[in-house]
């Protein structure tokens, strides 16, 4: 479970301080498709970067599976990014002279995984996004939608718990955007997918939860997650199941 508690993020010093996030608190479910919706400069990408450990909060706390990150060292953040998070960027970030297969394998190169295992997992990831027959192409031989699917495969190869997507369809046409969104929707069935977007139609069509942000503050949440209250509800339902209802057919003789 991922939780942000009163997150504040400031840039600059003295009179030049800019507050990008101001008291953001939110809890995410283990598997859901969350769209963070807002205009440019509202703080949504900063929020995504803090969730992914690419940037650090000024105050507040990011809680990962019940553990505070306030005392995290660099190695802890590295482990979190490498094993728990998959990143998908609008610009794809593919290496142009490498094949599709090599680009996806690269995510495992520093993880100590054997070459044969890297190859196997990269092929499986590419098959999941419908590119199992495009392994040896270079990025410049592919369409924008295909390159974004390569980026998704690369993000999946470590089997992360959380997938973070920053405007994943921003550079794509409508038809290709639909293909990418359908893949993300499928992934969200057993992972937490958090997507930053400024496109309300896209968010409403595909996300299971829409979080709105404006001027560094959350202004709306279509399906808030409050684990304590949900636990209470589950417990109440469980208790109700064991409530004994007297049988009116039973009589007591005098």
Residue ranges and their predicted role:
Residues 2-207:
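ABC family nucleotide-binding domain
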């Amino acid at each position: 479970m991922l939780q942000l508690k009163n997150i504040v993020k400031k840039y600059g010093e003295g009179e030049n301080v800019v507050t990008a996030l101001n008291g953001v608190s939110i809890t995410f479910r283990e598997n859901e498709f969350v769209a963070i919706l807002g205009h440019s400069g509202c703080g949504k990408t900063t929020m995504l970067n803090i969730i992914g450990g690419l940037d650090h909060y000024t105050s507040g706390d990011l809680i990962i599976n019940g553990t505070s990150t306030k005392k995290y060292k660099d190695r802890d953040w590295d482990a979190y990014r490498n094993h728990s998070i998959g990143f998908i960027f609008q610009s794809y970030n593919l290496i142009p002279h490498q094949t599709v297969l090599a680009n996806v394998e690269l995510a495992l190169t520093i993880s100590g995984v054997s070459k044969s295992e890297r190859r196997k997992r990269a092929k499986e990831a590419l098959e999941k996004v419908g590119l199992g027959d495009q392994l040896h192409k270079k990025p410049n031989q592919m369409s924008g939608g295909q390159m974004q699917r390569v980026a998704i495969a690369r993000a999946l190869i470590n089997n992360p718990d959380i997938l973070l997507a920053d405007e994943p369809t921003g550079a794509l046409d409508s038809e290709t955007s639909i293909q990418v969104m359908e893949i993300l929707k499928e992934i969200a069935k057993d992972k937490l997918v958090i997507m930053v977007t400024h496109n309300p139609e896209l968010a409403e069509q595909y996300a299971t939860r829409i979080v709105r942000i404006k001027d560094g503050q959350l202004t709306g949440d279509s399906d808030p997650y409050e684990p304590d209250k949900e636990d209470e509800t589950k417990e109440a339902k469980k208790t109700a199941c064991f409530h004994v209802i007297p049988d009116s057919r039973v009589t007591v003789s005098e």
